[in-house]
Amino acid sequence: MKKLFVVLVVMPLIYGDNFPCSKLTNRTIGNHWNLIETFLLNYSSRLSPNSDVVLGDYFPTVQPWFNCIRNNSNDLYVTLENLKALYWDYATENITLNHKQRLNVVVNGYPYSITVTTTRNFNSAEGAIICICKGSPPTTTTESSLTCNWGSECRLNHKFPICPSNSEANCGNMLYGLQWFADAVVAYLHGASYRISFENQWSGTVTLGDMRATTLETAGTLVDLWWFNPVYDVSYYRVNNKNGTTVVSNCTDQCASYVANVFTTQPGGFIPSDFSFNNWFLLTNSSTLVSGKLVTKQPLLVNCLWPVPSFEEAASTLCFEGAGFDQCNGPVLNNTVDVIRFNLNFTTNVQSGKGATVFSLNTTGGVTLEISCYNDTVSDSSFSSYGEMPFGVTDGPRYCYVLYNGTALKYLGTLPPSVKEIAISKWGHFYINGYNFFSTFPIDCISFNLTTGDSDVFWTIAYTSYTEALVQVENTAITKVTYCNSYVNNIKCSQLTANLNNGFYPVSSSEVGLVNKSVVLLPSFYTHTIVNITIGLGMKRSGYGQPIASTLSNITLPMQDNNTDVYCIRSDQFSVYVHSTCKSSLWDNVFKRNCTDVLDATAVIKTGTCPFSFDKLNNYLTFNKFCLSLSPVGANCKFDVAARTRTNDQVVRSLYVIYEEGDNIVGVPSDNSGLHDLSVLHLDSCTDYNIYGRTGVGIIRQTNRTLLSGLYYTSLSGDLLGFKNVSDGVIYSVTPCDVSAQAAVIDGTIVGAITSINSELLGLTHWTTTPNFYYYSIYNYTNDRTRGTAIDSNDVDCEPVITYSNIGVCKNGALVFINVTHSDGDVQPISTGNVTIPTNFTISVQVEYIQVYTTPVSIDCSRYVCNGNPRCNKLLTQYVSACQTIEQALAMGARLENMEVGSMLFVSENALKLASVEAFNSSETLDPIYKEWPNIGGSWLEGLKYILPSDNSKRKYRSAIEDLLFAKVVTSGLGTVDEDYKRCTGGYDIADLVCAQYYNGIMVLPGVANADKMTMYTASLAGGITLGALGGGAVAIPFAVAVQARLNYVALQTDVLNKNQQILASAFNQAIGNITQSFGKVNDAIHQTSRGLATVAKALAKVQDVVNTQGQALSHLTVQLQNNFQAISSSISDIYNRLDELSADAQVDRLITGRLTALNAFVSQTLTRQAEVRASRQLAKDKVNECVRSQSQRFGFCGNGTHLFSLANAAPNGMIFFHTVLLPTAYETVTAWAGICALDGDRTFGLVVKDVQLTLFRNLDDKFYLTPRTMYQPRVATSSDFVQIEGCDVLFVNATVSDLPSIIPDYIDINQTVQDILENFRPNWTVPELTFDIFNATYLNLTGEIDDLEFRSEKLHNTTVELAILIDNINNTLVNLEWLNRIETYVKWPWYVWLLIGLVVIFCIPLLLFCCCSTGCCGCIGCLGSCCHSICSRRQFENYEPIEKVHVH
């Protein structure tokens, strides 16, 4: 059972508050000891075992605690000012139901404020509520329900019980509290703590309202109710947690320094995130970073932290191996100790004389070096007398040396004015305030002794190991560390930020580490040569005792052809080994003694000027020729041979190299002579490979493909894609060890990841698929949907927190697709256009393409630059935020574009139904009155069948067989003469004259006579001639009559033919005119079609350009991977394979610089393109609103003409518009008048047209007319068309360019602005020339289609030319007939006709007169009969019958 001891020291009351209370009690902790207990439960629980720390914060204090007894009133409240924190407690001793009262705590801030409202429901699970919201909270509340309605955008809206476990018995042990900071709020409620991070401003004013506490006293004692502890300053408590016992006490001595400098190591050796890193520095072997962030390997993994209370006179020895960690503060790690850090934790200046007298470094080989400093120039005899290594601020300059046996080996330099940290690495590096002060051989142990000091400051000793971390540095000191030890922390490291905003981030490539080596070579018979190089070093001392390497040191090569100066490789393989000896001398150059102590040295061969390192020769480097020489004659490069001592490296000789690049000679680590296939493959795992001379890191997998040619296969960027095993022909693929992915981070946690392969990553196990990628998430997709199917937006109902393009991720990790906003309908007002003055129009459909969005691009900068090489990644961190800037620029650009595109697009269901050509041409959606037409919206050719003439069923025609079997004689007949003649004759030729017909009173006979008729009339004629002399000429009368009748027929037929000719000529000429006009319209239609096809071709060309632009940019970016940017190779792995680390770093740095430049160029191009697309997106939006949803008034905005209507359709990355416009085909040229200037005596005034859509012009008849600008329709102007102006003067303002902004505020001289930018921001560096190449991505290739459209357009144009020629030919075929003379003959009627007419008149007239005058009731006969009847008989009355109704229909 854990024990708890509380040692309290009562602090005197130093402040107080004036409370508007009827009774006020100010007391110390008293019965409120549970406050400290609660505090310990919240804070000591996070401490590791074996901890001894001082905690400082705005904690509750021992005193004062206030008890305020107020009257039962709602309108009063207590106000506290300048607070940092507030704690309160509810005591339950002697409390009845009447004592349970409400409390409303309000902390005012901007824009957020805090309220904690407590009700009287002490036993309820939701008896209180905390609200952190925007707004102004009330000081009091009467609400019975707990809500946060007073504010908006609440950061915290949480209900909690007043008493733990909802039991009143636990209330007395409960602590409530609030702390507020500029970036966070901490709340202590019902035994739990909440920390909410956000930016806010706090006034420090707290109000306590609704304290309707009772004034009752129990047994004469004031009842404890609500108790308050206002906190104004930081309080410190010391917590010691050892062996399961926690001891807490007030900290009274150096509390602030202890909090700032001593921490408890967290499990895993991590330093707490809230540690201040006071006097901790970034260790560096080169220049010191002043301020910034970088990812680096630093000794920040603490194996043991040993706090030393104060300086004590003592001597200590600390070793890197086998260190005893018995005084550690926190957990202990058993990792290898890399660096021991001595940190002086002080806040005030510590004078010199308080520190170590000397630091002794026990190096390998048993040599002990000492480091000490002196305040003036010293002699050799006094080096060991009064030297020191002071901590803190020195009172003067200190000159430091490396000593050996009291002799100075090397002068190190001047000690910094203030020594705050000393760090010593086991690799022999000695750091002061982070700077590498000295380097020597590896160190085993450190010994030091401390001087006695009167200061009571303390210091710490930290045994640390190297780890990768994101380090923030300010003024050369570490201020914050983020360990790169988890998935989310790796992203933080890659983004160079400790706090990740919600968004998508590229997943950093994991470090490969030590992997197996795969080698693929061609099978061959190998011969092997071992090259042994012996280097004999000569060492001696200088006048001050420092070791000096002699330039007489000897290099011995194997003998070849009786020559030891040059050695060439003559075998297929070779291995090079170096053997080093060391001899010394006293003063001369005779080196016979063994090197001991500080004279001990080792020979090393450095890279020098060669593009490969000496120690990499046996790492499968290949050559066509390779020779080593001691002479520079004919050499390509050289190695530097150096003597490495305990203090420095000294170059003594040079080893020259003669080489040619190729594959004939291979450097190998061991002898492999004979017939061998030396290939070694490690399949299906990450391996470091050398495949036919190409090196890298990747996963090798066997494939089923068969390729006939080639040994290895690369991409355009030079990356190895696969290779062939020549022995069996098997093809192997090579893929990267790590595949780039995008992690979705919300509230600092990875909730999902987008990847191109179906493999678990980032610890995410739940996954789903989309058409373009796999998505892994913390969200567990239900079993209702089959895993691996395409996700549907309705699967998850949640609000996305982050979006990228058209996808979003919710807080629970679920992936949703963002739907476009739907609208209820379209409004399409009609308006006129602003055009010139045409007289005729033609309809044209014009195509226009506008880009609306670009495809989002995400680039893993470190992957592109380094391709996963761990050493390159370390170098890349030196470029600070270069990658972060590139990635964030692309991500922010994509998010901004997604937001704009999402807010732009709306979908109308009604408009969607008409969004296809079929629906637009269909009459189903039209009113019934229009459905009789086949196609309203289009011009389909099948509609012509309805206007073609139909067959006449009344006409009778013979069949084709009848036309073949019968001979036909076709003549022209007169009316019904021929038909009547045939009926009369009945087929008898003798009845020819009897059946003669009359046409217009003239006797006629059909003009055709058969053989029988000709015989009959010939006989009649012959008989008449023969008998004529005898008086028988009358026989020829039938012949004469028949001939004359037939001549009459011909004459009348000629007249009819003449009339028919006139009708025919008129009709033919009219037909020719119609044909000419029709062909003219066809010609015009084909011409317009040609122009339409040209616009379609241009639009498609623009679509192709838009789609391929990004691919070209990516191709451009990919091609840069082939450029070496003046490095020895474009392959980073190959560079590190050939060179030592330092030389390779210099070469790789060139690649990093070049590739970052290429990335910056790509990002600049992308952002520029996005800016252009943003403008075109607004243009598309304007065109949708003005062209599609309404009718444009602007000429040329919706097509080149007067706009009628437009259709929009989706196109790759944009929208394509089909504008239907009226194109003027004929114009009327007029002289427009701006107005009329009139004189009235001495007064001059002007008249201008009121309507700006009208044009005033003066015609040839000197009259003024007005016409609309849309079409030439002149009319006479009236007075109502004009308005009067004051004068006729026209004023012009003469201004310079500098005056234009004062006249036109938004005027910008673009040319001058660009010129200023170029002058002021001219780069002072040279950007490498980047050439374009083909990118292996999908391209939209419409070149063939565009060429076909252009060819068809040209062919149609040629057709129009041919039609114009045909029209001219048709015009030349107009008929001009020669009219026949028409003779009119009048024939008088015979005498007997007139006789008959006279007889009829004589007979009929008397008869008619008699009938009219003598008959009837009033006639003469009628009157006579009536008189006779009346005389002979009496009068009788007629009998009448009843009248009946008569219906007339």
UniProtKB/Swiss-Prot annotation:
Motif interval(s): KxHxx: 1445-1449
One Pfam family, short name: CoV_S2_C
CDD domains noted in UniProt: TGEV-like_Spike_SD1-2_S1-S2_S2
Stretches for region Interaction with host ANPEP: 657-801
Entry's transmembrane regions: 1391-1410
Intravirion-facing ranges: 1411-1449
UniProt-annotated location(s): Virion membrane; Host endoplasmic reticulum-Golgi intermediate compartment membrane
Fusion peptide: annotated segments: 1022-1043
Coiled coil: 1104-1148, 1338-1380
PROSITE patterns registered for this protein in UniProt: COV_S2_HR1, COV_S2_HR2
GO cellular component, one term: host cell endoplasmic reticulum-Golgi intermediate compartment membrane
Signal peptide, first to last residue: 1-28
Region (Heptad repeat 1 (HR1)), start-end ranges: 1037-1156
Family annotation (Gene3D superfamilies): 1.20.5.300, 2.60.40.3130
Chain residue ranges for the region called S2: 777-1449
Region annotation (Heptad repeat 2 (HR2)) ranges: 1305-1402
HAMAP family according to UniProt: ALPHA_CORONA_SPIKE
Summary of the function given for this chain in its UniProt record: S1 region attaches the virion to the cell membrane by interacting with host ANPEP/aminopeptidase N, initiating the infection. Binding to the receptor probably induces conformational changes in the S glycoprotein unmasking the fusion peptide of S2 region and activating membranes fusion. S2 region belongs to the class I viral fusion protein. Under the current model, the protein has at least 3 conformational states: pre-fusion native state, pre-hairpin intermediate state, and post-fusion hairpin state.
Domain note: The KxHxx motif seems to function as an ER retrieval signal.
Protein name as catalogued: Spike glycoprotein
Gene behind the chain: S
